[in-house]
Amino acid sequence: MKRSGLVLILSILLVYVFLLGPLVIISFSAFNESEFLDFPPKVYSFRWFFRIFESEMFVSAFQTSLFVSLLGATGALLVGLPAAYSLSRTRAKWRRAVLSLFMSPVIVPGVVLGFALLKHIVITLEIEILTGMAMGHMLIMIPYVIRVIVSSLSNVPIEIEEAAVSLGCSNTRAFLMVVIPNIRSGILAACLLAFITSLNDVPVTIFLTGPGVTTLPIQMLSYVEYYFDPTVSALSVLLMLLTVTIMIVIESTMGLSFFTKK
């Protein structure tokens, strides 16, 4: 084997160890019987998983996360679907500029976006925290929704839509009856990806929490400031399983290669 090939293999192995090593440690720690983060565990137990569901603060935080993620995903889809359709069907010079504008929430640091929402929406406009949080999550979801749906629409020839219109369909009916059925998998993948992004968000959400209103990642962050037991490790395992499950669904519906298409 050439020296360069050996170096490449070792580099890849180091990257995998660096990325997956902490996840392996956390996963094993979640099944620890002890109240301390021992690795490897001396005795295995599901004790900390049961404790999660017995804890009102974690259950309440998950319910808030679920509500905000679903509401934000719905709003992002209502904005992103027509925007993606318009961008995919136009060849105007301003197309790239508008697409870049919709991608700006990804470019702007989350802490900047979160602080801006706190100052100008929650404080200045006196909008309640939960609504402001949902708006913030909708903003960070929109780029993912647009990106996925634009990629999905690139596989739908405009000719079939024009044929439907020539046969008597209105533009709206052609969109609903011809275009939407052909991009159902793309819409599903966009919503799931947006949901994952929202569920795991910390930088934006940390500025928008308040008394009785906090999401699961923020609650986990607050918990580890005072406690050092494996409860958060167990929660991390559950979140990883949820994320992996959703990514498998996305892969089975569209394929993850859609996210790399231009």
Model-derived regions, located:
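Hydrophobic alpha-helical transmembrane segments of multipass integral membrane proteins
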Residues: 59, 63, 67-79, 83, ...
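Short membrane-interfacial helix/loop motifs at transmembrane-helix boundaries
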Residues: 21-56, 209-211, 262
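Transmembrane-helix boundary motif in ABC transporter permease subunits
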Residues: 1-5, 70-102, 115-122, 175, ...
